[in-house]
Each structure stands twice: as C-alpha cells, then as structure tokens.
UniProtKB/Swiss-Prot annotation:
Taxonomic source organism: Paenarthrobacter aurescens (strain TC1)
Catalysed transformations (reactions): S-sulfanyl-L-cysteinyl-[protein] + uridine(34) in tRNA + AH2 + ATP = 2-thiouridine(34) in tRNA + L-cysteinyl-[protein] + A + AMP + diphosphate + H(+)
Listed name of the protein: tRNA-specific 2-thiouridylase MnmA
Region span, Interaction with tRNA: 148-150
Gene3D superfamilies (UniProt xref): Adenine nucleotide alpha hydrolases-like domains, HUPs, Translation factors
Disulfide pattern: 101-199
InterPro entries noted in UniProt: MnmA-like (IPR004506), MnmA-like_C (IPR046885), MnmA-like_central (IPR046884), MnmA-like_central_sf (IPR023382), Rossmann-like_a/b/a_fold (IPR014729)
Function per UniProt: Catalyzes the 2-thiolation of uridine at the wobble position (U34) of tRNA, leading to the formation of s(2)U34.
C-alpha cells in the first residue's frame, strides 16, 4: 500500500513510520506546519509542531530512507482549532483542542489530501487499534498499553476515516519498548520527552492568552444560592471544577474550599460551591458521531450498557446510554446522546467530550452540552 506517515517529530510517529516501512509499504513522510510563526509554539519537553519538531521529523525520515515533505496547514489549523478554542471559551465551554485537531486536521484535511494524491492510508503514532470484522467493517479499540491509550481523542473518527487509518503501535506493550526500538533503529528522537499541554499557547498561561483574544469583563462570583461572594476578571477564563484563581471575599460558612460549578457567560457570572456539588450522574451530548458503524440500539433508540470517559486519561465509568431526537431553538431536529452514569463523576464541563466504550471498543462520542446531578438537580 501507499502510506502517508504523519511525522510529528516525536518518537511514536517515527517508530510507527519505521514499522510501516518494515511491513513493505511504500511510505512517504509528511510534517504538518500548523503555524507560520512556529517560534510562538511550545518547544522542548512541552511542545509540538515547532521548527525543532520539523527537523526531528526530517532526520527520522532520512534514517528510514523515505521522502519527506512539509505541508502548510496553518490557515486551516488557525480556523478549525485555534479559533474554535477561542469561540468555545467565549461561550463558557471547555474545549479539547487536541481532539479537534484530530477531527479536523489530522484525520480530515490530511487524510483528504492524502487520498486525493493516491495514498491508501495515513499512518500515525497514536496508541489505538483498528480491528476489521468478517464483513470488512472497521472498529476502533483501545491499544494494548492502556496507560498510553489514545483511543479517547480518536473517538471522533468515522467509519470511512478508520478504513484509511493505520496505527502500528496498537499492540506495543509499553512506551519504554517504543523508545528502545527507536534506539535500535538509530532514531535521534529515541529519548525525546513527550509533548504536553496546548501547543499554540507558548507559555502555558491559558487564562492570559485568552485575555488577549476575548473581551474580558469583570463580574460577580455567586454561590449556589445566588448570593455574591466575590468578583472575577472575566468569566470566560474559568472552567468547571476549577479552584485556583478564585478571589472570594466571602468565605464558605463551613470554611471549606469552593469550586467553579457553572459558567454563565450571558450574565457574566461564575457560580461556585462545595466540591460535593461537582458530582454529576447525567450527561447530555450533541454533535454525536460513531467510530465505525453504530450498534443496533442507536437506530432504535433503545438503552445500551457501556462505559463513559470524559477525559483523555480519565477512568471510564459504567453507564447506560441512549440516543433521542430533539428539536433545537431553530426548529431543526438533531440527535442527542443521553448518558446516565452508575458512578458519579466530578468536574464535568460543557464543551468537553464524552466517549463511550464497550469493552475495548470505542462506540462513539458527543460534545457535552449539559451535565447535572439527577439527585440534586443543581446544574
């Protein structure tokens, strides 16, 4: 097969490309330029997508003896990932930019261009697994190394995208083995630290970065009863579950710390309360999609057992889910995912993503529109 290897400049994508070459595929490496000012992106142990990473990707391709190209996706990244991040925070939601990048850049724009150029598949260094059944249908599953598993951030992939996706690290038992293999292959990135945080926020100060992009206006911090307990410099920079950065003039009666329970951007208010009120057991999601073909219960609206995960490395919890049709404010009917959790989760914020699993299989995902406690009816 003709395979396009997405080279991030890290050890995982380098070893994934090496395995694709070793498997006999015709492999071409490509690095995505996601900014026309890469010096503003994070570097070293906490970054990705920088000039340094581009050079590391080139060196890896040189060792592997495969062609290397750089594709400029900076405008699309700015529009589909960076601007989306700003818009979501402005609306009082908490987005996941890495998931959005996978959805709109790596497995949309990149895959579309690859197929147009005659490639059969895109190969990445993600820790996830694609399984094909007897009918040729593709399913997305967790990787062998659950500690490094990245199936959560790939839950947005469609069946058609999975048909053209390769994850050579799927059965690798540990990251240590990947690094050891890179060392044996003479890849200079063998001991390169993993990237973390948000690549387009150079100093990691999300609140400060957002303050330059969003009109921040001081407003009230209120408790769960509506009483004013402090002021904030701008509601949009907060997220549900946050404790740090709250300047409360009125302490809680019990003396215990308070956490952000809700963001109300239209009122420019931040609602705070005790940690216990962060526990939610019902999630309602929009923008529902299925990884592979949806299970039969989706079409009938029947409930089905699953596990729900709301963070990339969070613990999945038992849940019961169903899909129902709802009519939005504009009169358009759309699908809504309703997930009832057996074990409550804390700090679930609108804008985050809930991904559903059955065993190791990823069923699908939705963007969280609302989260509440069925017992307290707080949020």
């Amino acid at each position: 097969m003709r395979v396009l290897a997405a080279m991030s400049g890290g050890v995982d994508s380098a070893v994934a490309a090496a395995r694709a070459v070793e498997a006999g595929h015709d492999v071409v490496g490509v690095h995505l330029a996601l900014s026309r000012m890469p010096g503003t992106l994070r570097t070293g142990s906490r970054g990705c997508c920088t000039i340094e990473d581009s050079r590391d990707a080139w060196r890896a391709c040189d060792v592997l003896g495969i062609p290397y190209y750089v594709w400029d996706f900076s405008e699309r990244f700015k529009e589909d990932v960076v601007q989306d991040f700003i818009d979501e925070y402005a609306a009082g939601r908490t987005p996941n930019p890495c998931m959005r990048c996978n959805e709109r850049i790596k497995f949309a724009a990149l895959l579309e261009k690859a197929i147009a150029l005659g490639f059969d598949a895109v190969c990445t260094g993600h820790y996830a697994k694609v399984i094909e059944d007897a009918d040729g249908n593709r399913e997305l599953h967790r990787a062998a190394d659950w500690a490094k598993d990245q199936s959560y951030v790939l839950g947005v992939l469609t069946h058609e995208q999975l048909k053209h996706s390769m994850f050579p690290l799927a059965d690798t038992p540990s990251k240590a083995e990947v690094r050891a293999e890179a060392e044996r292959r003479g890849l200079s990135v063998a001991n390169k630290p993993d990237s973390h945080d948000i690549c387009f926020i150079s100093d990691g100060d999300t609140r400060g970065w957002l303050a330059e992009k969003i009109d921040m206006t001081t407003g009230d911090i209120v408790d769960e009863t509506g009483a004013k307990v402090g002021e904030h410099p701008g509601a949009n920079a907060f997220t549900v579950g946050q404790r740090r950065g709250l300047k409360l003039g009125t302490p809680a009666a019990d003396g215990k710390p308070r956490f952000v329970l809700e963001i109300r951007p239209k009122e420019n208010k931040v609602v705070v309360g005790p940690e216990a009120l962060l526990a939610i057991d019902e999630i309602r999601g929009i923008k529902v999609s299925w990884a592979g073909l949806p299970i039969s219960e989706v079409a009938t609206g029947a409930e089905f057992d699953c596990h729900a995960q709301v963070r990339a490395h969070g613990d999945p919890v038992p849940a019961i889910a169903r899909v129902e049709a709802v009519t939005d404010e504009s009169g358009v009917e759309r699908a809504q995912l309703v997930v009832t959790l057996t074990d409550p989760l804390r700090g679930v914020a609108p804008g985050q993503t809930v991904v559903l699993y059955q065993g190791s299989r990823v069923l699908g995902q939705a963007t969280i529109d609302a989260a509440r406690s069925l017992q307290r009816q707080v949020l």
